[in-house]
Amino acid sequence: DNEELRESYVMEAIYWDVLRGYLYDIENRIANIRSLVKKAENLETLNETPVRIAEARKSFADAMPGTDLSHYTFEDAQGKTVSLADFKGKYVFIDMWSTGCNPCIGEIPYIRDLEKRLSGKPIVWVSISLDLNKKVWLDFLQKNNMSGIQLICDKGFKHPFIKQIGLSGIPQFLLLDKEGKVIDANTLRPSNPVMGKLLEFILNRSE
């Protein structure tokens, strides 16, 4: 009935707000919907929400603009350790992806277009895969002649870098400044036409 639909809707709205980090005045919003929630499982979820809010606030604070991520290291296709600090002096555009993620793969042509469009500018293109099977990742790189700097996050979602940036799903894109500090930990997708214009603005301003 309408009451059940309303209850389902408000629970889903709160869930997505917490997940996406829309935390402004959320405690009051939860208090306002509490009278609409009747189901035991929803009440239990609502009672657990403050813990999730605290975790979300911490993860978003950990990846706030200005946060230094340059100390993190990953493995490249040759098995060498690569540090994000290696790219200091250039902006870093990071693509968090995996070979089994169709939306991630759909962004690859747009990343390549941006690479060509911004060739010669002080920016590097880093793709960090969350594949747990290294061979699958390596085969994909070879088969698709992948460009840019290809790294793998061997611990998947358990890697401290993943926890710090508050990654909840892929693809996710990050932009770091020339010191390896966060400009945006969840920036626009390359397929969004605004992304190219934003990068051009930032890079032209830095020259």
Task: Describe the role of every protein-language-model region.
Residues 91-92, 171:
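Alpha/beta-hydrolase fold active-site loops
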Residues 146, 153-203:
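Thiol/disulfide oxidoreductase modules built on the thioredoxin-like
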Residues 1-82:
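Oxidative protein folding and maturation machinery
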Residues 88-90, 120, 146, 167:
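Active-site acidic short loop of glycosyltransferases
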Residues 82-83, 183:
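Generic structural signal for well-ordered beta-strand positions
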Residues 106-144, 156-162:
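Structural microenvironment flanking redox-active thiols in thiol-disulfide oxidoreductases
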Residues 88-89, 95-113:
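Conserved redox-active cysteine motifs that mediate thiol-disulfide chemistry
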Residues 94, 126-128, 151, 174:
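Conserved hydrophobic packing residues within short motifs/helices of P-loop NTPase cores
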